[in-house]
């Protein structure tokens, strides 16, 4: 992890905008706290990915929360493509003034360089495949599929730099660890499987009981 952090810190010197991919189901738990300090001086966009798997009402609340705190935030689904074009628009919006200054100085057509970060299994590679309209990157429901740094050029003068997903060495709370386990972000053998299953079912029954009953055709009687 230390090596990857050093590489990201070095790459940030070349970057205009940072896109942080988070899981819309766990928007706080899916942020690497070590990255927060690294990117604090850069323009940022939080993309709540996998929105098709999340509670839409809760996602909208989180989007409002981030915006109320001065952060750009967008709900998206790399699976369906919903919200992806809004990310491009937000990049253009954030870079509007800088582009005007560059044009005044004669640097017309200067590419906007964007760093895409995120912990494993939040859909980073799927997001880049969708936004670049390609399927050349390794994608899978397995933490840590992306291993090497990759530059991807988009048609609208934006260059994306992808980096491997990085988890932090110690989770600050049991809730964070459980949330990561619920969504398959950490390996199955890190936490006791029975405990994870019990806690997830308990959460679902307390918050989405009718959904569970409908999904598994449970007889209410």
Q: What spans do the regions from the language model cover?
A:
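Active-site cofactor/substrate anionic-group-binding motifs, chiefly glycine-
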Residues: 42-52
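Anionic group-transfer/hydrolysis microenvironments
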Residues: 22-25, 51, 131, 164
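Canonical P-loop GTPase G-domain recognition
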Residues: 51-118, 136
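Glycine-rich phosphate-binding P-loop
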Residues: 113-133, 137, 163
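Helix-rich effector regions associated with P-loop NTPase G domains
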Residues: 1-17, 25-26, 31-34, 38-44, ...
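Residue-level signature of catalytic and energy-coupling elements of molecular machines
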Residues: 23, 66, 127, 162-163
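Conserved, well-folded catalytic cores of nucleic-acid-processing
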Residues: 38, 65, 69, 90-98, ...
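Structural beta-sheet core signal
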Residues: 20, 46-48, 116
């Amino acid at each position: 992890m230390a090596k990857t952090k050093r590489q990201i810190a070095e790459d940030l010197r070349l970057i205009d905008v940072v896109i942080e991919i988070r899981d819309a189901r766990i928007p706080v738990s899916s942020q690497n706290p070590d990255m927060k300090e690294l990117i604090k001086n850069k323009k940022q966009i939080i993309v709540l990915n996998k929105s098709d798997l999340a509670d839409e009402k809760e996602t909208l609340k989180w989007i409002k929360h981030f915006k109320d705190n001065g952060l750009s935030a967008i709900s998206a689904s790399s699976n369906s493509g919903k919200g992806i074009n809004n990310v491009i628009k937000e990049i253009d919006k954030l870079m509007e003034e800088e582009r005007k200054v560059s044009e005044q100085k004669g640097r017309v057509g200067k590419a906007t360089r964007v760093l895409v970060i995120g912990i494993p299994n939040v859909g980073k590679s799927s997001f880049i495949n969708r936004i670049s309209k390609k399927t050349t990157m390794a994608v899978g429901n397995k933490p840590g599929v992306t291993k090497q740094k990759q530059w991807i050029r988009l048609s609208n003068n934006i260059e994306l730099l992808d980096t491997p997903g990085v988890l932090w060495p110690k989770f600050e709370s049991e809730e964070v660890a459980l949330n990561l386990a619920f969504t398959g972000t950490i390996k199955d053998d890190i936490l006791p499987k029975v405990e994870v299953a019990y806690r997830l079912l308990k959460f679902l029954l307390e918050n989405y009981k009718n959904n569970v009953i409908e999904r598994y055709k449970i007889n209410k009687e």
